[in-house]
């Protein structure tokens, strides 16, 4: 072995056993192969500050395409390079994105050089930043997906502004502020665009709120006038059966529409069948008198305030309808119903009657004034008394009493004077003052008798007694007029005969004495009044 071989072996062993300097190793590695770290702090800043409201697709691609200078760039591969020609220049957004990528890559390289002196600290920082970058990248992807879904909904603009505002505040709390001055401009423009978008949403939401009723008045459905039905003639055709009962040969006729309808069926007709007036054309489906009265009471203030604007025909129709409604409800008093069982208060009936008197005395309706009111009331009372008589006859349990004329008159008088008379006087009370003020009224008499001029006290009470006298008493005892012995003597003999045959008692005679005595106070100075005075004399002679 030569001296040269020995020297060569020593050099080789020295080179192999020489300790490795970490600084030299790091420098060599940095020069030949850069350390693969995850220092993407600037990249995170770009994700936060990129304006995604204008071009979401390009912004997402640019964020995903950021790499180290040595790694391949997305802009240099794939379909994007196809459009990078003279005929198809790149968009301004793409150019601005690549420019920001280059500046941020240089800053990243400088940061990696300054941090390579401390490998332990660099390794720990890289680990923390890796986890932060991963979470922030997921958050950025979630924002992009949310923005895309919001664009597909009708209210996407409004919800996009709210969602982007929330995520931007959250990202600013967990992201370091970039040192790039352009990032502040980008962030301020994003806030301005979000605010502008929110204002547009508010305008779209509320631009028609203050004018939503303008232009819609013409298409609104017409509301029917509640007063028009009272001005229609068909509404007044629902007449009370008491107004035409005297034309039915004494049979009891009931409309069946009243709340106090009778259950009597003397003619064998189906009780569910409504008996109609052939002259009135009453609709079987018409409302009952109670509902019509309540409807009238609800509209009475409006009618009183507006009746002066009606023409003559409307006033006449309104007057007839009000009177028919009033009579249909008051007729229940002649069906052995007391006043407290009626479906309206006494004050309500008085108000309706007062308004009827106002309409009836209007020159556009009639020129007869109070005389026409008394004539209408008399017609109603006479027909209602026929109803009362028929009802008592068909409902009285003792046939012997009903078949005797004296006893039957006593029963009808007691019911009329003890119940109907005072209840009816309370309902017709407003007419008392009107009649007393017009004391020289001319009452239309029935039959062929002339008009009789009545002086002195004339009230509703006298009118009620007069109607009872003419409709109930005189038809039964008028045959005594043709007697040769005189009315009073013939009537006395008749009473003595009935005491033996029909067992007429002193109570029955006293009842007739009361009846004829009260009827004689009418002082009408006519033929009917003279007959009552003769009958009163005959009953006195029989006691």
Curated annotation (Swiss-Prot):
Start-end of Polar residues biased regions: 94-121
One term under GO cellular component: cell periphery
Disulfide bond entries: none
Keyword Cell membrane: yes
Sites of Phosphoserine modification: 59, 139, 144
Subcellular location: Cell membrane; Vacuole membrane
InterPro entries in UniProt: Bit61/PRR5
Membrane topology: Peripheral membrane protein
UniProt keywords, alphabetically: Cell membrane, Membrane, Phosphoprotein, Vacuole
Pfam families (alphabetical): HbrB (PF08539)
Something else known: Present with 1960 molecules/cell in log phase SD medium.
Homology family: Belongs to the BIT61 family.
Protein name: Target of rapamycin complex 2 subunit BIT61
């Amino acid at each position: 072995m030569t001296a040269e071989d020995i020297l060569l072996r020593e050099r080789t062993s020295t080179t192999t056993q020489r300790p490795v300097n970490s600084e030299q190793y790091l420098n060599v590695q940095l020069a030949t192969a850069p350390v693969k770290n995850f220092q993407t702090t600037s990249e995170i800043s770009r994700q936060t500050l990129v304006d995604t409201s204008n071009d979401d697709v390009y912004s997402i691609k640019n964020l995903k395409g950021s790499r180290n200078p040595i790694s391949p760039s997305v802009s240099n591969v794939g379909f994007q390079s196809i459009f990078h020609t003279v005929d198809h220049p790149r968009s301004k957004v793409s150019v601005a994105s690549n420019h920001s990528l280059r500046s941020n890559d240089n800053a990243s390289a400088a940061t990696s050089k300054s941090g390579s002196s401390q490998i332990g600290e660099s390794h720990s920082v890289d680990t923390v930043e890796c986890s932060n970058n991963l979470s922030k990248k997921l958050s950025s992807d979630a924002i992009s997906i949310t923005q895309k879904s919001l664009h597909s909904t009708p209210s996407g603009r409004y919800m996009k502004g709210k969602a982007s505002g929330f995520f931007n505040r959250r990202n600013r709390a967990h992201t370091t502020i970039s040192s790039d001055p352009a990032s502040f401009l980008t962030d301020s423009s994003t806030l301005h665009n979000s605010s502008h978008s929110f204002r547009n949403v508010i305008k779209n939401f509320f631009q028609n709120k203050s004018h939503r009723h303008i232009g819609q008045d013409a298409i609104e459905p017409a509301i029917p006038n509640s007063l028009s039905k009272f001005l229609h003639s068909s509404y007044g055709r629902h007449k009370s059966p008491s107004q035409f009962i005297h034309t039915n040969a004494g049979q009891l006729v009931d409309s069946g529409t009243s709340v106090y309808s009778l259950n009597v069926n003397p003619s064998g007709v189906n009780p569910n069948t409504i008996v109609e007036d052939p002259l009135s054309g009453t609709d079987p489906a018409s409302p009952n008198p109670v509902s019509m009265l309540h409807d009238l009471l609800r509209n009475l203030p409006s009618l009183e305030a507006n009746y002066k604007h009606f023409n003559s025909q409307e006033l006449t129709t309104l007057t007839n309808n009000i009177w028919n409604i009033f009579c249909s409800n008051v007729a229940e008093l002649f069906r052995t119903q007391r006043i407290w069982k009626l479906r309206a208060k006494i004050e309500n009936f008085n108000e309706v009657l007062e308004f009827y008197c106002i309409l009836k005395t209007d020159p556009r309706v009639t020129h007869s004034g109070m005389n026409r009111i008394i004539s209408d009331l008399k017609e109603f009372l006479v027909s209602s008394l026929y109803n009362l008589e028929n009802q008592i006859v068909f409902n009285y349990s003792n046939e012997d009493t009903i078949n005797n004329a004296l006893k039957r008159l006593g029963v009808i008088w007691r019911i009329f004077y003890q119940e109907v008379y005072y209840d009816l006087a309370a309902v017709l009370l407003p007419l008392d003052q009107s009649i007393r003020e017009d004391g020289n009224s001319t009452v239309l008499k029935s039959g062929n008798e002339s008009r009789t001029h009545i002086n002195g006290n004339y009230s509703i009470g006298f009118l009620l007694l007069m109607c009872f006298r003419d409709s109930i008493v005189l038809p039964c005892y008028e045959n005594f007029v043709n007697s040769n012995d005189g009315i009073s003597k013939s009537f006395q003999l008749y009473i003595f005969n009935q005491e033996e045959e029909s067992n007429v008692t002193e109570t029955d005679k006293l009842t007739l004495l009361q009846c004829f005595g009260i009827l004689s106070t009418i002082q009408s100075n006519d033929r009917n009044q003279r007959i009552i005075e003769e009958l009163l004399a005959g009953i006195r002679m029989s006691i």
